[in-house]
Amino acid sequence: MQGKIIESLAGFYYVESDGQIYQTRARGNFRKKGHKPYVGDEVDFSAKENSEGYILAIHERKNSLVRPPIVNIDQAVVIISAKEPDFNHNLLDRFLILLEHRKISPIIYLSKTDLLEDLDEFKKVQKQYQKIGYYFVYYLEDLTPLLKDKITVFMGQTGVGKTTLLNTLAPDLALETNEISDSLGRGRHTTRAVTLYNIYGGKIADTPGFSSLDYEITSSEELNAAFPELLKLSAACKFRSCTHTHEPGCAVKLALAQRKIWEKRYQTYLQILSEIENRRETYKKVLKRK
């Protein structure tokens, strides 16, 4: 039989096949090979009626996220709050960079707009991200049509309203939520496992919240590729290995001077580039000590 893993919990993998859910375990050979099944995996499995089944094979994956562990994702809704916690340009860009690097299409959803007096400021932000090529929405009626026939991950900083949004989309789920802590300005984690839910003709994952992001990006070339607007311009740079910082004939620096690209995004690029270089220098020092 073939199916898709829709939930992983306490060593069990729940596989959906032909409208039925089967409780399965992974064969021991997966552990020996270090090839663990994840939510989103297409698998071959065996199962008898009213008995526990076993995963026999895992199909090739098209992409993956490490944290949360989920694979074969079509798109990700990055939920960023307008307030409580306050809107964070830098954090949003870091989510987008992660998704670009992982070849997952992002959708930006602005939550908690009811706490704003007006949306004028964010309409300007929306235009900037739309100019890059991203969906940027803050109404459910704009989001729901984008979910059909897709596997969609919901992700964002803790406390931005992921679970609340899912409960609005599908009240029958009744997922647990918690309010923001006044002292910390962040929410408590309420999502304990990665689970795929059937909603609006697609599958949606509510994932554990994040306070920080880990990257596999280790070079300026990889970072450049994670910024669509910089990648497009970099073909016109004088030097192929241009870092868009000090090199002559840099098309990105020219576009920045002409205000054709958003300076806030460029500043995020410079910050992360500096972090990459600092990690590289730290690694070199460690190697010298050895």
Swiss-Prot record:
- Subunit structure of this entry? Monomer. Associates with 30S ribosomal subunit, binds 16S rRNA.
> What is the documented function of this protein?
One of several proteins that assist in the late maturation steps of the functional core of the 30S ribosomal subunit. Helps release RbfA from mature subunits. May play a role in the assembly of ribosomal proteins into the subunit. Circularly permuted GTPase that catalyzes slow GTP hydrolysis, GTPase activity is stimulated by the 30S ribosomal subunit.
> What keyword terms does UniProt attach to this protein?
Cytoplasm, GTP-binding, Hydrolase, Metal-binding, Nucleotide-binding, Ribosome biogenesis, RNA-binding, rRNA-binding, Zinc
Provide the GO MF annotations for this entry.
Answer: GTP binding; GTPase activity; metal ion binding; rRNA binding
InterPro entries recorded: G_CP_dom, NA-bd_OB-fold, P-loop_NTPase, Ribosome_biogen_GTPase_RsgA, RsgA_GTPase_dom, RsgA_N
In this protein, which residues make up the domain named CP-type G?
A: 62-213
The protein's name is: Small ribosomal subunit biogenesis GTPase RsgA
State which residue ranges cross the membrane.
Answer: none
Q: Where in the cell is it found?
A: Cytoplasm
Q: Which GO terms describe its biological process?
A: ribosomal small subunit biogenesis
**Positions of GTP binding:** 111-114, 156-164
Which cofactors are required for activity? Zn(2+)
